[in-house]
Amino acid sequence: HQRANLQNKGKKPDVLYMSATPIPRTYALTIFGDMDVSTIKERPKGRQKITTVVKKNSEIKDVLEMMYKELKQNHQVYVIAPLIEESENSDLTTVCKLKDQMKLAFGEHYKIDIVHGKMASAAKDMIMNQFSENKIQILISTTVIEVGVDVPNATTMVIFDADRFGLSTLHQLRGRVGRGSSKSQCILISDSDAERLKIMEQVDDGFKISEEDFKLRGHGDLFGTKQSGDMSFKIANIRSD
């Protein structure tokens, strides 16, 4: 709606849409919106491909060792949880629980802190600045850090209950590392065999991931607010036709 209003301000304006990880609806618009598509496939100079692996909860010791290896090299680590606090209706990993676990494993030698959406903006900004300056080595967070965070020294992204996140979110979170010249890794922790986790291990191209997300979730409304699901056409198949 906002984009349509902007376009209506001029007479047939040229419009440039930019996206690192298109959601299914955006991908559908490129197919059916008569758009020319240009992709930048090269990584910025000096950056390496991010290695993505899936680990089960029983392999947490291996994950901690992978984190420690990077911390010893003076690198930093993101740890992501789907929830802030424990809930009676859910057994998902929480930021608060991970803070205790990480302090037990690394608290003697490394500074650990948390950030999430319920915190005041000033408090979040202070913690993010400290992380940027390497005054915090392990940052535990919700998906609040999935966009707009650039810390080249952070080389490891650990995502707990990774099967609870969509492909676009996982790809955005993975993009918080690999922003410097050092080799980086993304570790997805889940006991699920979800198809999207296998896709994350094999694919690092944002448009390809969007295409797979399109297949898994549907495209939503082209002229509405729904960002996933089907259009419920009686005959046509949007993907194959």
Locate each region found by the language model.
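Glycine- and acidic-residue-enriched helix-capping/strand-helix junction motifs
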Residues: 86-98
